[in-house]
Curated annotation (Swiss-Prot):
One of its GO terms (biological process) is tRNA wobble uridine modification. Its cofactor is FAD. This is tRNA uridine 5-carboxymethylaminomethyl modification enzyme MnmG. Coiled coil: none annotated. FAD binds at residues 10-15, 122, 177, 366. It is found in: Cytoplasm. It comes from the Bacteria. Homodimer. Heterotetramer of two MnmE and two MnmG subunits. NAD(+) binds at residues 269-283. InterPro entries: FAD/NAD-bd_sf (IPR036188), GIDA_C_N (IPR049312), MnmG (IPR004416), MnmG-rel (IPR002218), MnmG-rel_CS (IPR020595), MnmG_C (IPR026904), MnmG_C_subdom (IPR047001), MnmG_C_subdom_sf (IPR044920). NAD-binding protein involved in the addition of a carboxymethylaminomethyl (cmnm) group at the wobble position (U34) of certain tRNAs, forming tRNA-cmnm(5)s(2)U34. Belongs to the MnmG family. Keywords: Cytoplasm, FAD, Flavoprotein, NAD, tRNA processing.
Length: 622
C-alpha cells in the first residue's frame, strides 16, 4: 500500500504551493489532482497580482514559492497599478499566457524533489481517533498518510449556473466532488455556500479595436520573483471599452432570467468582483462600466472581457455583448457562468491552517472562503510548510499581521470568519506602509531560511541583496551637495550652510530617484534589484515608518501574551456573560487575537490579563 507523509488534494494555486512547500522541507509528498494538464489552472482571469494581491505574490516568492517565478515565465503584459499614489498601495500585476503558465508550472512540479503527482479523484478521508489515517480514491484504493491538505477550490458540490441551466461541475468540463463534501459534513464541519463567476470568452479576431482604448503595459516589465533578472516573454497590449445604456437595458429586462436574481443561487458572491447584473442593480445611476479586454495568450485569439462576469442565459449574453463598442460583431467562444460551491467556516482552522477538529487535516484556498489565485496560493504555502513541519515534529510557522499580508489574511479568516468570498486589500492591513511589495523578501526570506523552506540559490541571492543594500545605503550617505549648490539647481532646501546627502534629499517633497541619478550619475549603476527605489521609499517615509514600528512592537507584545487552551472564561467574574460566550466560542490563542474579536471590550481584555497573571503566573499555555 502506498504511503506518504503529506498528501495534497487539488492541483490549483493553493495545492501547487502546498505540495511544493512540503516537498522543499524534505518531506515525501503526494499531490492528487484530476487532470495533469490543469496544474495551476487559471479558472477565471488570465492574470496574477494587482493591488494587495501583488504583495501576496511577492511574499509567496520570498518564501521560495512558485507563483512569482512562474508568472515571470508567462507574463505578457506587466503593469504597476496605483503607481501615482503612495508605495504602500502599489500593486504589481501581470497578464499571463495561460498555456505558458500551465506549461511552466507542470515542468517545475513534475521535476520537484520529494514530490509525486497522482492523477485521480479522492472520494473520502479515513480518520481514526480524530487523526488522519489515509485518503480513499474513487477506485477504492487507499493511500496512507500523516497529513492531508485540502485545496478543493470550487469543486466541493460545485454547481455551474447559466441562466436557468444547472450543470454539476467544479469547473467547465470537470466533475465536482460530492464525496469530500459529505466527509466534511460527517466530521461536523460547518459548511455553507459561496458563489463566484466568470465572463464569456470572445474571439479577438472579431473585435473592432478602433472603437476601444489602448492600454499599454509598463515599458520595462518588473519581475515578480527575486530569481528573475529580466522578463524574456514578448509583451502585448490590452484594450478598454465600456458598457452602454443599451447594455444596461438588456440586463434589466432579463434580470429574472439571471441565476443570481431569480433566487436559483443560494451562495453569496464576491462583493468586490460583482457580476454585470450586480453592477447594474447596485450602481443604477452609473451610465457605463469599464471592460478590460485581456488577451489569454500570445498565440491565442481568446479574449477575456474583464468586467462582465454573468450568469444570464447564453442568448442574452450574446445580445448584451453586441451593444458594447468594438464588440458589435464579436464571436462568443464560451458563455459566462456563475458557480456555487461549499466552503468551511474558517474559524474552524487555526493560524497554521490545521483544522481544530481533526489533527493533521489542513485547509487552504477557496475552501476557507477566499477568492483569488493569490489568496489561495498564500494559504497553500503556509499549509504546506506547517504540515511538513508537523511531520518533522518541529514548531509551527506562523505569519502575523505585523509581518505580512498573508498573516493579515489568515488572522482575518481565523478570527472573524467570512460569509462572502474574502479578497485581500491594502486597507485590511494596519501596517501597510511597512508591508510593501518591494520589501517582501526583506521581511520574510530570512524567516523561511530559518525553517529550511528556502533553496540555496535563493539564499545566495538574498544574502547578496542585503550586502548590496548596505553598500548602496553607505554610498547615499556619502554623496552630498551644499544647500547653496542645491538651490542653484532649483531644489528647495533651507539655506543653512550644511551639506545634504542623497538620503536627506529623498525626504524633500517631489524629489525622486530620477533627480538623484541626474545629480549623481554614478547612482545609475546601483539600480539593480530596485535597491535604490527601496532606499528612497524608506528615507521618504522614515518618520511614518518609525511610528508604525512602535505600533508593531505593541502589537507583538500582545501577540506574545498566550492564553492557555484550558482557560475557563466563565470563571472570570468581571466580564459579561455575552463576552464569556464569545471568548469560549472563538478560543483566542493570544491577547492580541482576543482584542480583535468583535464586541470584546478593553475592560474585558484587562480582566483577562489580570486573571492570567493570578491564575497562570508561571506563564503556562497548556
Amino acid at each position: 500500500m502506498l504511503k506518504y507523509d503529506v498528501i495534497v488534494i487539488g492541483g490549483g494555486h493553493a495545492g501547487v504551493e502546498a505540495a511544493a512547500a512540503s516537498a522543499r522541507l524534505g518531506v515525501p509528498t503526494l499531490l492528487i489532482t484530476l487532470k495533469p494538464e490543469n496544474l495551476g489552472e487559471m479558472s477565471c482571469n488570465p492574470a496574477i497580482g494587482g493591488i494587495a494581491k501583488g504583495t501576496l505574490v511577492k511574499e509567496i516568492d520570498a518564501l521560495d514559492g512558485l507563483m512569482g517565478y512562474v508568472i515571470d515565465q508567462a507574463g505578457i503584459h506587466y503593469k504597476m497599478l496605483n503607481e501615482t499614489r503612495g508605495p504602500a498601495v502599489w500593486g504589481p500585476r501581470a497578464q499571463a499566457d495561460r498555456k505558458l503558465y500551465k506549461k511552466a508550472m507542470y515542468q517545475i512540479l513534475t521535476n520537484y524533489p520529494n514530490l509525486d503527482i497522482l492523477y485521480g479523484k479522492v472520494e473520502d478521508i479515513e480518520i481514526k481517533s480524530s487523526k488522519i489515517e489515509a485518503v480513499i480514491l474513487n477506485n477504492g484504493s487507499k493511500i496512507l498518510c500523516q497529513k492531508i491538505i485540502l485545496t478543493t477550490g470550487t469543486f466541493l458540490s460545485g454547481l455551474i449556473h447559466i441562466g436557468q441551466k444547472k450543470i454539476p461541475a467544479g469547473r467547465v468540463d470537470e466533475e465536482p466532488s460530492y464525496g469530500l463534501s459529505n466527509t466534511l459534513k460527517q466530521i461536523g464541519f460547518k459548511l455553507a455556500r459561496l458563489k463566484t463567476g466568470t465572463p464569456p470568452r470572445i474571439d479577438g479576431r472579431t473585435i473592432d479595436y478602433s472603437k476601444t482604448i489602448l492600454q499599454p503595459g509598463d515599458k520595462i516589465p518588473r519581475p515578480f520573483s527575486e530569481l528573475t533578472n529580466i522578463v524574456n516573454v514578448s509583451q502585448i497590449n490590452c484594450f478598454i471599452t465600456k458598457t452602454t445604456s443599451e447594455t444596461h437595458d438588456i440586463i434589466r429586462e432579463n434580470l429574472d432570467k439571471s441565476a443570481m436574481y431569480s433566487g436559483q443561487i443560494e451562495g453569496i458572491g464576491p462583493r468586490y468582483c460583482p457580476s454585470i447584473e450586480d453592477k447594474i442593480v447596485r450602481f443604477s445611476t452609473k451610465s457605463e462600466h469599464r471592460i478590460f479586454l485581456e488577451p489569454e495568450g500570445l498565440d491565442d485569439y481568446t479574449i477575456y472581457p474583464n468586467g462582465i462576469s454573468t450568469s444570464l442565459p447564453e442568448d442574452v449574453q450574446h445580445k448584451l455583448i453586441k451593444t458594447i463598442p468594438g464588440l458589435e460583431n464579436v464571436k462568443v467562444l464560451r458563455p459566462g457562468y456563475a458557480i456555487e460551491y461549499d466552503y468551511v467556516d474558517p474559524r474552524e482552522i487555526s493560524v497554521t491552517l490545521e483544522t481544530k477538529k481533526i489533527a493533521g487535516l489542513y485547509l487552504a484556498g477557496q475552501i476557507n472562503g477566499t477568492t483569488g489565485y493569490e489568496e489561495a496560493a498564500g494559504q497553500g504555502i503556509i499549509a504546506g510548510i506547517n504540515a511538513a513541519l508537523a511531520v518533522k515534529d518541529q514548531a509551527p510557522f506562523m505569519l502575523t499581521r505585523a509581518n505580512s499580508y498573508i498573516g493579515v489574511m489568515i488572522d482575518d479568516l481565523t478570527t472573524f470568519g467570512t460569509i462572502e468570498p474574502y479578497r485581500m486589500f491594502t486597507s485590511r492591513s494596519e501596517y501597510r506602509l511597512s508591508l510593501r511589495a518591494d520589501n517582501s523578501d526583506l521581511r520574510l526570506t530570512e524567516l523561511g531560511m530559518n525553517i529550511g523552506v528556502v533553496s540555496e540559490k535563493r539564499k545566495k541571492i538574498f544574502t547578496k541583496k542585503c550586502e548590496d543594500i548596505e553598500k548602496i545605503k553607505s554610498l547615499l550617505n556619502t554623496l552630498s551637495l551644499s544647500t547653496s549648490k542645491l538651490a542653484k539647481m532649483g531644489i528647495q532646501v533651507a539655506q543653512d550652510g550644511t551639506y545634504k546627502t542623497v538620503l536627506d534629499l529623498f525626504k524633500i517633497p517631489n524629489f525622486n530617484v530620477e533627480q538623484a541619478i541626474k545629480i549623481f550619475p554614478m547612482l545609475k549603476e546601483t539600480q539593480n534589484n530596485n535597491i535604490l527605489q527601496l532606499l528612497y521609499i524608506e528615507a521618504k517615509y522614515a518618520s511614518y515608518l518609525t511610528r508604525q514600528h512602535a505600533d508593531i512592537n505593541l502589537f507583538q507584545s500582545e501577540e506574545a501574551q498566550f492564553i492557555p487552551k484550558n482557560i475557563d472564561y466563565f470563571k472570570i467574574p468581571s466580564i459579561s456573560l455575552e463576552i464569556q460566550e464569545k471568548l469560549s466560542s472563538h478560543k483566542p490563542t493570544t491577547i492580541g487575537v482576543a482584542r480583535r474579536i468583535p464586541g470584546i471590550t478593553p475592560a474585558a481584555i484587562t480582566a483577562i490579563i489580570i486573571y492570567l497573571k493570578t491564575k497562570y503566573s508561571d506563564g503556562s499555555s497548556t
